[in-house]
Amino acid sequence: MEALVYTFLLIGTLMVIFFAVFFRETPRILRK
């Protein structure tokens, strides 16, 4: 069960960082 929790937290952190960098580096898509 611990493996699933750690995996979930890891994926969640990676997704947050990915979206943060994505929205910072590509504001053109938001201004579509």
Curated annotation (Swiss-Prot):
Classification via InterPro entries: PSII_PsbT, PSII_PsbT_sf
Principal cellular location given in the protein's record: plastid
Subcellular location, record wording: Plastid, Chloroplast thylakoid membrane
UniProt topology in membrane: Single-pass membrane protein
Top-level division of the source organism's lineage: Eukaryota
The keyword Thylakoid is assigned to this record: yes
GO cellular component terms listed in the entry, alphabetical order: chloroplast thylakoid membrane; photosystem II reaction center
Segments traversing the membrane: 3-23
Keyword tags: Chloroplast, Membrane, Photosynthesis, Photosystem II, Plastid, Thylakoid, Transmembrane, Transmembrane helix
Keyword Thylakoid attached: yes
One record GO biological process: photosynthesis
Function of the protein: Found at the monomer-monomer interface of the photosystem II (PS II) dimer, plays a role in assembly and dimerization of PSII. PSII is a light-driven water plastoquinone oxidoreductase, using light energy to abstract electrons from H(2)O, generating a proton gradient subsequently used for ATP formation.
Quaternary organization: PSII is composed of 1 copy each of membrane proteins PsbA, PsbB, PsbC, PsbD, PsbE, PsbF, PsbH, PsbI, PsbJ, PsbK, PsbL, PsbM, PsbT, PsbX, PsbY, PsbZ, Psb30/Ycf12, at least 3 peripheral proteins of the oxygen-evolving complex and a large number of cofactors. It forms dimeric complexes.
Xref: PANTHER family: PHOTOSYSTEM II REACTION CENTER PROTEIN T, PTHR36411
Protein family: Belongs to the PsbT family.
Entry protein name: Photosystem II reaction center protein T
Organism: Trieres chinensis
Phylogenetic classification of the source organism: Eukaryota, Sar, Stramenopiles, Ochrophyta, Bacillariophyta
